[in-house]
């Protein structure tokens, strides 16, 4: 008998297609990306991410420092949330997967749970932290630092 979740697999093609769709926004040298924070390309990437989260039945919150938190409710409102994610902004010559893979992997987890009609006890929150690269606004990790209390607004 299979253990719970033993046969749980993401849709790799769907994740790849999402990565390639996001990579069309702010293409840069050598196949990388340039989606620096608070630029039109960053805004377009954030809008695309929000549309995918909405399509997956998640509710989107925009919080301090522009951090995006997409919520998938759990069955126990008192259970602590599980956070997964990273950032969508890039360096001027950023890699195609840097940061974005963490955000879109979290989204793919939600899509897979939805496909399999799996409810979780804990709320799952897919996060896009703003200005993680720090290219335009120092320091790097600014918004996640505010979120965890290292920096103040």
Task: List each language-model region with its residue ranges.
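N-terminal capping segment at the start of a domain
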Residues: 2-39
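N-terminal glycine-rich anion-binding loops that anchor highly charged ligand groups
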Residues: 14-28, 45, 60, 77-82
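Alpha-helical metal-binding/catalytic segments enriched in His/Glu/Asp
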Residues: 22, 84, 93-132
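A non-catalytic alpha/beta surface segment that caps or lines the substrate-entry region
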Residues: 28-73
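Catalytic-core environment of secreted peptidases
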Residues: 56, 68-101, 106
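A glycine-rich helix N-cap at a beta->alpha junction
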Residues: 124, 139, 143-153
């Amino acid at each position: 008998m299979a253990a719970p979740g033993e046969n749980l697999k993401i849709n790799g093609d769907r994740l790849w297609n999402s990565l390639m769709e996001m990579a069309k926004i702010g293409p840069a040298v050598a196949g990388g990306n340039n989606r620096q924070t608070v630029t039109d390309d960053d805004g377009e990437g954030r809008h695309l991410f929000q549309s995918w989260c909405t399509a997956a039945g998640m509710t989107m919150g925009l919080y301090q420092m522009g951090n995006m938190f997409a919520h998938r409710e759990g069955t126990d409102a008192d259970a602590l949330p599980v956070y997964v994610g990273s950032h969508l902004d890039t360096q001027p010559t950023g890699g195609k997967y840097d940061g974005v893979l963490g955000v879109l992997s979290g989204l793919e987890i939600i899509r897979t749970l939805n496909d399999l009609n799996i409810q979780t006890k804990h709320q799952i929150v897919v996060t896009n932290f703003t200005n993680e690269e720090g290219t335009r606004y120092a320091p790097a990790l600014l918004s996640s630092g505010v979120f965890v209390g290292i920096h103040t607004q």
